[in-house]
């Protein structure tokens, strides 16, 4: 949780900087860096190898950890290089997302709507408290009501998110190294969220959009369905208090489905149906976006140009929002669930 992360940060940073420590670039200590690097020498190398069949002759002092310690013998470089060549290992490619331009752009102080196409509006706002940082947060939403009335569509959205996240792991890692983040969310449609340095966010978005139309193989799709079914089953064994919010939503919000309904829909899911659903969302959704931080209007319009190469925004669709149950006086809603763990929980 956020509170736990702040408590952990107190072990490493002064109290007054536990919140902004990841974003501060002052106080660089070249001597301290050189001292640390001087300790990273081959003589201090420790290599851990863990398996169930290793002989052991020692135990850890405070934990159960049988182990043994051996000196590392210098390898035969010729044989080692031959093994590397056989495995086809290569150095990673150059990270093309590393920021190069840290200039600050003129962003509006108030929320400013920008109409980029018919029925497509993006909102732009500069940061008040961090206006001197070359960073920003942007989110693009493709909104559809398909999952509000159909469990099968809800399942396809979950599978889309799972497959996209898996396929885009290398890109997300590259972005993280470059000081940015990339994530996809699926609810009433899908959303792409980018945050961090704004210099190379257009390049990151372009590559993220290239993989938006996920084209899994039959094997990859089957594995995604299996992960979803396993997740549904595992959720039943979570601590009961963690289930309160989903179960409350099941009672009070449109577009929420029981585990049985989701499992049944997942069992019926097909690759052909999934591809049809993806095409439907990309071609009929309501599109909107928000940009907060170091952006200007040209950046916003540039994002839509990239987006329009993959997504066809509907000129008539509206933002899909889940209906919420309106309480009635003297009416009580009751939901009981048996849990497969020796625990109980109550929310009222």
Placement of each model-derived feature along the sequence:
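M16 family metallopeptidases and their MPP-like homologs
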Residues: 1-33, 48, 131-268, 284-293, ...
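His/Glu-based metal-binding/catalytic segments typifying zinc-dependent metallopeptidases
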Residues: 2-23, 49-53, 60-159, 286, ...
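Generic recognition of flexible, low-complexity loop/linker segments
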Residues: 31-37, 110-111, 125-129, 179-181, ...
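Extended, domain-scale alpha-helical bundle/helix-rich regions
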Residues: 35-39, 43-48, 52-55
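Composition- and surface-driven signal marking solvent-exposed, interaction-prone regions
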Residues: 59-64, 153-154, 158, 175-179, ...
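A common structural junction motif
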Residues: 209-218, 307-317
């Amino acid at each position: 949780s956020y509170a736990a992360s702040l408590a952990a940060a107190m072990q490493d940073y002064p109290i007054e900087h536990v919140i902004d420590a990841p974003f501060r670039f002052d106080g660089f200590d070249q001597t301290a860096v050189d001292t640390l690097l001087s300790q990273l020498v081959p003589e201090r190398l420790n290599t851990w190898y863990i398996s169930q069949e290793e002989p052991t002759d020692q135990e850890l002092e405070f934990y159960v950890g049988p182990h043994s310690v051996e000196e590392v013998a210098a390898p035969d470089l010729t044989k080692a290089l031959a093994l590397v060549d056989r495995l086809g290992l290569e150095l990673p490619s150059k990270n093309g997302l590393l920021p190069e331009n840290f200039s600050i752009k003129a962003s509006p102080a108030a929320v400013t709507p920008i109409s980029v196409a018919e029925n497509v509006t993006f909102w732009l706002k500069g940061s008040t408290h961090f206006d001197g940082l070359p960073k920003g947060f942007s989110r693009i939403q493709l909104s559809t009501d398909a999952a509000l009335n159909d469990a099968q569509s809800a399942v396809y959205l979950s599978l889309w998110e799972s497959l996209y996240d898996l396929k885009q792991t290398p890109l997300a890692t590259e972005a993280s190294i470059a000081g940015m983040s990339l994530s996809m969310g699926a609810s009433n449609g899908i959303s792409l969220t980018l945050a961090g340095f704004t210099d190379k966010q257009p390049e990151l978005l372009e590559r993220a959009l290239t993989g938006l139309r996920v084209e899994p193989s039959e094997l990859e799709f089957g594995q995604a369905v299996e992960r979803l079914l396993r997740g549904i089953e595992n959720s039943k064994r979570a601590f009961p208090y963690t289930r309160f919010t989903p179960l409350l939503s099941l009672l009070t919000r449109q577009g929420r489905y029981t585990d049985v309904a989701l499992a049944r829909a997942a069992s019926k899911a097909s690759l052909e149906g999934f591809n049809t659903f993806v095409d439907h969302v990309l071609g009929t959704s309501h599109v909107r976006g928000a940009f907060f931080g170091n952006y200007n209007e040209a950046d916003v319009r540039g994002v839509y140009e990239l987006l329009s190469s993959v997504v066809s925004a509907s000129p008539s669709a509206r933002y899909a929002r889940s209906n919420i149950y309106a309480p009635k006086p003297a009416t009580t809603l009751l939901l009981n669930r048996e849990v497969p763990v020796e625990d109980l929980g109550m929310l009222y």
